[in-house]
C-alpha cells in the first residue's frame, strides 16, 4: 500500500532598482506610479544596532531598502550584521538570493500580468525593506512582516509590484516589512551527515527568517514600530514559511499574529530524506567526506545543478519505496533542533496556541484554463472526461458534490477550481481551531480578473494586490478598475484590522466569525462578499480520497 504524506510542499514543485535622488524629485513612471519624493543626507535617518541608515520619503511614507539584518557564510547559521560608520544609504533594494531560472515565465501574457522584478543575485542577501509613516516619533505602530512566495527555492521581497508597502503603511498607519533570505541549496541543503559544523545547514534559510524577526524585535522601534505587535503574513511559499515559523521554538515571542495565504504547510521534509538529498548532492559534486569544506567554494550554478540532480534521484528512489515523491525539494527539515516536529501534523503547534490566525486560498490557484487555452471553452462532457482520469468510479460523486458547493458553476470550473491548496488550508484551520486557543479566520478569494479576457480568473497570487491595497499599482494583474479598487479597500482593511487587533472584521464586509470544524465559516471575497458555511465539505471528502496530482 502506498504511503502518502499530507504536505503543502506540493506547491514547491509547481512554483517556485529603485530610484533615488537628492531633493524633491518626481520618480519616473518606469520606477513607480508617481508621487513626490524627498531624499537627502538629513532626511529619513534612523539608527539601528549596526549603525544609521538613510532612506527617503515618498508621499509621506518613510522608505528604507536593502538594510542588512544579518550576515552568514555559506551553509552556516546567520550572525549579527557588521557595524558601519556614518549613514548607510538604504534607498535601493539589496541583492536577492541566487536562484534557478524563473519557472513562471510560461507566456508573454503571464509576464505582462505578473511583471516580475528579479533584482540582482548575490549570496550576501540578508536584507529587509521597511515602509513606515514615521520614524523617531515615539509612536508604536503594528508591524506587518511579509514573507515572499516561490516555495523555498525562489522569489524575493521585491519580485512583484504588489509587494510595495507604501499604500498599506499609509492607509493603516502600520509598518510594513519585506525581506530576502537564503533559498534552495543555499538555504536548505542538509549536510548534517558531514559533521557538527554543518549540523544546521538544512535549516539555515529558516534561521534567516528568525534572525530577521530578531532584528526587527531590537530595531523596529526606531522606525515607529511596536515590537510587541508583529504580524507575519505570506503567500504560497511565504505561507509555508509562516506555517513553519509557528512551530519553530527560536521564533516564539517574536510575532503575535499570523496569516497564511495559499500556503498551508502541514508537513515538511523528514531528516532521513533531506540527508539523502545532501549526500547525493555531495556525490554529484564528486566530493568525498574528507573534502567536504570544498563545497564552500564551488560555484553557485554547479552547486544548484548538483542539488537538483540529487532531488531527482531521491524522488525516484522514494517512488520505488511507495512514498509520494512530490514532497521532496528545497524546504526546512525536521531536525529535532531548529524544527523539532512537523508544523501541523498531527496537531497544531502548542507554542502558537494563543496566536490568532487567518488562513485562505484563491478559488482557482493554478488555473488549468490559463495554461491550456482550449479548456477556456470546454464543454461539460469534455470536462467530465478529464475528471474521470483522476476520480474514476467516483466521478459522479465528485459532480454531485461540486454542484452543491458551486451551484452556478461553468464547465471550466470543474477543472479550474483549486483542490491542491484548499484541502490543506481547511485542515490547518481545523487543527488550529481544535486547540481552543486564539481564533482562526478562513477566507476564499473568488474575484476574477478581467485582464486579457479573464484568462487568469482568481489565479495564484491574485489576492496579493488587494491585501496590499495595490490594485492600481499592479493593474496588469487586476485591471485597476472601480470594482477591484473597492474590494482592495475592504480586503486591505481586513488585513490591517487583523494586524492591529487579531480580528479582521471591517466596514463593507459581512460579519466574519471565527472558523470551527462544525460550521466552517468562510469569507468569500468578491464584488459582493459573503460568509458561507461548510460549502464544500462533501466535495473535499471526495477530493481527499485521491492523491493531489492534478490531471
Predicted segments with their positions:
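Alpha/beta-hydrolase active-site loop
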Residues: 125, 199-221
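C-terminal motif of bacterial Sec signal peptides marking the signal peptidase cleavage site
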Residues: 16-18
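Active-site loop->helix "elbow" adjoining a glycine-rich segment at hydrolase catalytic centers
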Residues: 149, 204-208, 236-239
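Alpha/beta-hydrolase fold nucleophile elbow
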Residues: 223-235
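Non-catalytic accessory segments of hydrolases
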Residues: 20-203, 227, 326, 477-491, ...
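Mobile gating loops/cap/lid regions near enzyme active sites that modulate substrate access
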Residues: 67, 423-551
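Substrate-access "cap/lid" subdomains that shape
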Residues: 114, 218, 252, 261-382, ...
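Short glycine-enriched nucleophile-adjacent loop
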Residues: 239-251
Amino acid at each position: 500500500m502506498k504511503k502518502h504524506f499530507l504536505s503543502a510542499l506540493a506547491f514547491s514543485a509547481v512554483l517556485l532598482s529603485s530610484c533615488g535622488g537628492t531633493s524633491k524629485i518626481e520618480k519616473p513612471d518606469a520606477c513607480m506610479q508617481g508621487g513626490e519624493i524627498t531624499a537627502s543626507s538629513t532626511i529619513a535617518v534612523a539608527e539601528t544596532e549596526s549603525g544609521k541608515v538613510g532612506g527617503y520619503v515618498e508621499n509621506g511614507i518613510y522608505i528604507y531598502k536593502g538594510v542588512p539584518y544579518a550576515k552568514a557564510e555559506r551553509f552556516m547559521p546567520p550572525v549579527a550584521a557588521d557595524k558601519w560608520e556614518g549613514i548607510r544609504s538604504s534607498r535601493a533594494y539589496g541583492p536577492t538570493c541566487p536562484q534557478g531560472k524563473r519557472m513562471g515565465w510560461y507566456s508573454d501574457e503571464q509576464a505582462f500580468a505578473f511583471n516580475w522584478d528579479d533584482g540582482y543575485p548575490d549570496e550576501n542577501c540578508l536584507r529587509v525593506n521597511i515602509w513606515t509613516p514615521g520614524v523617531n516619533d515615539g509612536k508604536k505602530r503594528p508591524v506587518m512582516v511579509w514573507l515572499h512566495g516561490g516555495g523555498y527555492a525562489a522569489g524575493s521581497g521585491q519580485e512583484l509590484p504588489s509587494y510595495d508597502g507604501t499604500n498599506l503603511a499609509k492607509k493603516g498607519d502600520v509598518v510594513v516589512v519585506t525581506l530576502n533570505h537564503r533559498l534552495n541549496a543555499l538555504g536548505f541543503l542538509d549536510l548534517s551527515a558531514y559533521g557538527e559544523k554543518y549540523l544546521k545547514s538544512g535549516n539555515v534559510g529558516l534561521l534567516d527568517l528568525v534572525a530577521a524577526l530578531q532584528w526587527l524585535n531590537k530595531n523596529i522601534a526606531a522606525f515607529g514600530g511596536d515590537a510587541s505587535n508583529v504580524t507575519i503574513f505570506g503567500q504560497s511559499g511565504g505561507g509555508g514559511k509562516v506555517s513553519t515559523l509557528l512551530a519553530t521554538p527560536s521564533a516564539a515571542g517574536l510575532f503575535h499574529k499570523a496569516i497564511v495565504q495559499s500556503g498551508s504547510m502541514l508537513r515538511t521534509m523528514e531528516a532521513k530524506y533531506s540527508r539523502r538529498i545532501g549526500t547525493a548532492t555531495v556525490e554529484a559534486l564528486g566530493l568525498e567526506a574528507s573534502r567536504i569544506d570544498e563545497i564552500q567554494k564551488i560555484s553557485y550554478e554547479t552547486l544548484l545543478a548538483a542539488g537538483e540532480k540529487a532531488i531527482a534521484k531521491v524522488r525516484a528512489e522514494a517512488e520505488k519505496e511507495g512514498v509520494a515523491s512530490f514532497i521532496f525539494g528545497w524546504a526546512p527539515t525536521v531536525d529535532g533542533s531548529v524544527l523539532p516536529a512537523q508544523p501541523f501534523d498531527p496537531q497544531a503547534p502548542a507554542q502558537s496556541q494563543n496566536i490568532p490566525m487567518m488562513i485562505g486560498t484563491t478559488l482557482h490557484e493554478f488555473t488549468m484554463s490559463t495554461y491550456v487555452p482550449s479548456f477556456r471553452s470546454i464543454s461539460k462532457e469534455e470536462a467530465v472526461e478529464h475528471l474521470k482520469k483522476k476520480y474514476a468510479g467516483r466521478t459522479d460523486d465528485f459532480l454531485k458534490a461540486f454542484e452543491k458547493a458551486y451551484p452556478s458553476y461553468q464547465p471550466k470550473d470543474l477543472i479550474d477550481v483549486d483542490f491542491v491548496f484548499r484541502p490543506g488550508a481547511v485542515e490547518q484551520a481545523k487543527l488550529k481551531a481544535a486547540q481552543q486557543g486564539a481564533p482562526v479566520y478562513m477566507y476564499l478569494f473568488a474575484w476574477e480578473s478581467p485582464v486579457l479576457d479573464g484568462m487568469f480568473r482568481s489565479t495564484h497570487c491574485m489576492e496579493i494586490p488587494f491585501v496590499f491595497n495595490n490594485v492600481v499599482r499592479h493593474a496588469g494583474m487586476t485591471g485597476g478598475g472601480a470594482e477591484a479598487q473597492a474590494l482592495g479597500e475592504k480586503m486591505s482593511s481586513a488585513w490591517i484590522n487583523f494586524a492591529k487587533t487579531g480580528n479582521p472584521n471591517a466596514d463593507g464586509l459581512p460579519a466574519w466569525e471565527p472558523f470551527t470544524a462544525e460550521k466552517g465559516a468562510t469569507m468569500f471575497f468578491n464584488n459582493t462578499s459573503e460568509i458561507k458555511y461548510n460549502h464544500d465539505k462533501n466535495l473535499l471528502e471526495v477530493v481527499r480520497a485521491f492523491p493531489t496530482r492534478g490531471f
